[in-house]
């Protein structure tokens, strides 16, 4: 089975969707290459699975440089930043996924690095210590985050480019599915089936690729009806999954609003997962209302459960 990496486009011309973002990136990349400069520091924010890592790798490929990848929660102290940057060469890309999770010491070290491409470090102890300035090759920092509000203002101001990646249009998701099926599987899928997969992907390319792989698995085993396949893997109308349905049923059983803490206890899920993975899509489809008193299912949410016979 193909990995997520193999589904990723390697160059901007192969990236499907987000036309305005692509057109702007093409301008910025062309200018950087002609001026022989490193690409400006870039912040990508948006939902998981919308192409932030893919775009970081594309920028590195377009600039013909290496991409060094790490996670924000691994960078807590100045020494973590020093160790990371000790590996880079001139104009390389450093990609920090979930950059909001960096520690305070790492953030403070990044501030001077991003502007001056140097780090001031203490060598020695006590009265014998002295400050030494360590020069860093010019590089491009690309940060990705699903929580834009947690990015410190001082860090945000140091990015030359800030791009928001939201959900993709259904036609864009359909094009992604069509291309990946042709390139990797060549399974018989008609236009209606491709659109059905796309309409259940919540506008997220990563989810679309996951659904495509599951459809391929079942079709290879003789299951040809897409709707039946989705029932077997518990994917419901609009792409809602079992967690979404369980959440809606918790609210359906309440006469009044219910708080996030209580929902988390009933579902045995952490509050962060509920707030970031479940609720945004349900709010978008007007299935729930959220206010200071808590959460409440809407008429649309109740109709969805009843029409799909999903009341538990």
Curated annotation (Swiss-Prot):
NCBIfam families: PRK00080.1, ruvB. ATP binds at residues 8, 49, 52-54, 115-117, 158, 168, 206. It is found in: Cytoplasm. Residues 237-312 are annotated as: Head domain (RuvB-H). The RuvA-RuvB-RuvC complex processes Holliday junction (HJ) DNA during genetic recombination and DNA repair, while the RuvA-RuvB complex plays an important role in the rescue of blocked DNA replication forks via replication fork reversal (RFR). RuvA specifically binds to HJ cruciform DNA, conferring on it an open structure. The RuvB hexamer acts as an ATP-dependent pump, pulling dsDNA into and through the RuvAB complex. RuvB forms 2 homohexamers on either side of HJ DNA bound by 1 or 2 RuvA tetramers; 4 subunits per hexamer contact DNA at a time. GO terms for cellular component: cytoplasm; Holliday junction resolvase complex. Its EC number is 3.6.4.-. One of its GO terms (biological process) is DNA repair. It is an enzyme of class 3 (hydrolase). The gene is ruvB. Has 3 domains, the large (RuvB-L) and small ATPase (RuvB-S) domains and the C-terminal head (RuvB-H) domain. The head domain binds DNA, while the ATPase domains jointly bind ATP, ADP or are empty depending on the state of the subunit in the translocation cycle. During a single DNA translocation step the structure of each domain remains the same, but their relative positions change. Keywords: ATP-binding, Cytoplasm, DNA damage, DNA recombination, DNA repair, DNA-binding, Hydrolase, Nucleotide-binding. This is Holliday junction branch migration complex subunit RuvB. Residues 1-168 are annotated as: Large ATPase domain (RuvB-L). Residues 169-234 are annotated as: Small ATPAse domain (RuvB-S). InterPro entries: AAA+_ATPase, AAA_lid_4, DNA_helicase_Holl-junc_RuvB, P-loop_NTPase, RuvB-like_N, RuvB_C, WH-like_DNA-bd_sf, WH_DNA-bd_sf. It comes from Ureaplasma parvum serovar 3 (strain ATCC 700970). Its main location: cytoplasm. Homohexamer. Forms an RuvA(8)-RuvB(12)-Holliday junction (HJ) complex. HJ DNA is sandwiched between 2 RuvA tetramers; dsDNA enters through RuvA and exits via RuvB. An RuvB hexamer assembles on each DNA strand where it exits the tetramer. Each RuvB hexamer is contacted by two RuvA subunits (via domain III) on 2 adjacent RuvB subunits; this complex drives branch migration. In the full resolvosome a probable DNA-RuvA(4)-RuvB(12)-RuvC(2) complex forms which resolves the HJ. SUPFAM superfamilies: P-loop containing nucleoside triphosphate hydrolases, Winged helix' DNA-binding domain. DNA binds at residues 290, 295. It catalyses: ATP + H2O = ADP + phosphate + H(+). The lineage of its organism: Bacteria, Bacillati, Mycoplasmatota, Mycoplasmoidales, Mycoplasmoidaceae. Mg(2+) binds at residue 53. GO terms for molecular function: ATP binding; ATP hydrolysis activity; four-way junction DNA binding; four-way junction helicase activity. SMART domains: AAA (SM00382).
């Amino acid at each position: 089975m193909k990995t997520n990496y193999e589904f990723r486009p390697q160059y901007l011309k192969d990236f499907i969707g987000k036309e305005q973002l692509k057109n702007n990136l093409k301008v910025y990349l062309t200018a950087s290459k002609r001026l022989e400069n490193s690409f400006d520091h870039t912040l990508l924010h948006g939902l998981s699975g919308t192409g932030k890592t893919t775009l970081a790798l594309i920028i590195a490929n377009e600039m013909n440089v290496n991409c060094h990848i790490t996670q924000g929660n691994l960078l807590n102290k100045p020494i973590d930043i020093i160790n990371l940057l000790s590996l880079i060469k001139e104009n390389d890309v450093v990609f920090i996924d979930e950059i909001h999770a960096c520690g305070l010491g790492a953030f403070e070290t990044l501030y001077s690095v991003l502007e001056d491409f140097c780090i001031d470090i203490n060598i020695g102890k006590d009265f014998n210590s002295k400050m030494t300035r360590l020069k860093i090759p010019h590089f491009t920092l690309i940060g990705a985050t699903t929580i834009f509000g947690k990015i410190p203002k001082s860090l945000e101001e140091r990015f030359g480019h800030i791009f928001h990646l939201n959900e993709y249009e259904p036609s864009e998701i359909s094009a992604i599915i069509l291309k990946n099926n042709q390139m990797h599987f060549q399974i018989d899928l008609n236009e209606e089936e491709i659109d059905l997969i796309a309409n259940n992907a919540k506008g997220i390319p990563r989810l679309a690729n996951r659904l495509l792989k599951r459809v391929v698995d079942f079709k290879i085993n003789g299951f040809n009806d897409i709707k039946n396949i989705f029932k077997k893997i518990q994917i419901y109308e609009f792409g809602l999954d079992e967690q979404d349905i369980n959440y809606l049923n918790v609210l359906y059983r309440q006469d009044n609003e219910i708080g996030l803490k209580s929902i988390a206890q009933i579902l045995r899920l952490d509050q962060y997962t509920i707030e970031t993975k479940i609720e945004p899509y349900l709010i978008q489809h007007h299935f729930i209302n959220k206010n200071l008193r808590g959460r409440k299912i809407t008429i649309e949410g109740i109709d969805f459960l009843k029409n799909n016979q999903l009341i538990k």
